[in-house]
UniProtKB/Swiss-Prot annotation:
Belongs to the FKBP-type PPIase family. Keywords: Cell outer membrane, Isomerase, Membrane, Rotamase, Signal. Its EC number is 5.2.1.8. This is Peptidyl-prolyl cis-trans isomerase Mip. GO terms for molecular function: peptidyl-prolyl cis-trans isomerase activity.
């Protein structure tokens, strides 16, 4: 059973679904009906049905490409009934690789176009300073009064990273403590964007994917990254004293 669960969850993580109707008109009555039905289930039935919910939830977490949920369920039942799949394992792997590759390339192009459009428009906004043409910009949110950072020291800071749509993908604030970060270990746009910051300053960095993770890493490929950074302390001699 453990092997079955592991395989199904591993499969589910990679694939999204289509065909789900989330119409809100009958949501309350549907929920009440579901609660009545659930109360009549045995413990094993509850466990099994909850696993189905978990599988569906895992399937819907990614938007790389879509599968037909109805056909997914039919395929599971066919396997249980001992029937053959419409594709051999080799054919499936080949077609899946082709679909994933095409989806990845489309997402790369789409995100790159969005990043370049954003930077082009953003540089015209008040307070935005361009450090590298169409690649790296920043805006000062709060002026600092401490020492000026230069080079790549180890910096004590708070940061929040987000995408163009405002979705946060990482933040030091989640741990309530600032992070001590060697600027030699971060993406180029982050360390370059912090140059000239004063201790106490809060700055928003706008980083083109070429100066971030590009098409590699765990984030969506060619994502423009936005970091709000507060420099608390530059822990290195490679700083200058503010006049």
């Amino acid at each position: 059973m453990k092997n079955i669960l592991s395989w199904m969850l591993m499969f589910a993580v990679a694939l999204p679904i289509v065909g789900c109707d989330n119409g809100g008109g009958s949501q309350t009555s549907a929920t009440e009906k579901s609660m009545v039905e659930d109360s009549a289930l045995t413990d094993n039935q509850k466990l099994s049905r909850t696993f189905g919910h978990l599988l569906s939830r895992q399937l819907s977490r990614t938007e790389d490409f879509s599968l037909d949920l109805v056909e997914v369920i039919k395929g599971m039942q066919s396997e249980i009934d001992g029937q053959s799949a419409p594709l051999t394992d080799t054919e499936y792997e080949k077609q899946m690789a082709e679909v994933q590759k095409a989806s990845f390339e489309a997402k790369c192009s789409e995100n790159l176009a969005s990043a370049e459009k954003f930077l082009k428009e953003n540089k015209e906004k008040a307070g935005v300073i361009e450090l590298e043409p169409n690649k790296l910009q920043y805006r000062v949110v709060k002026e600092g009064t401490g020492r000026v950072l230069s080079g790549k020291p180890t910096a004590l800071l708070h940061y929040t990273g987000s995408f163009i749509d405002g979705k946060v993908f990482d933040s030091s604030e989640k741990n309530k403590e600032p992070i001590l970060l060697p600027l030699t270990k971060v993406i180029p746009g982050f360390s370059q964007g912090m140059q000239g910051m004063k201790e106490g300053e809060v700055r928003v960095l706008y980083i083109h994917p070429d100066l971030a993770y590009g098409t590699a890493g765990q984030l969506p490929p060619n994502s423009l990254l936005i970091f709000e950074v507060k420099l608390i302390e530059a822990n290195d001699d490679n700083v200058s004293v503010t006049e």
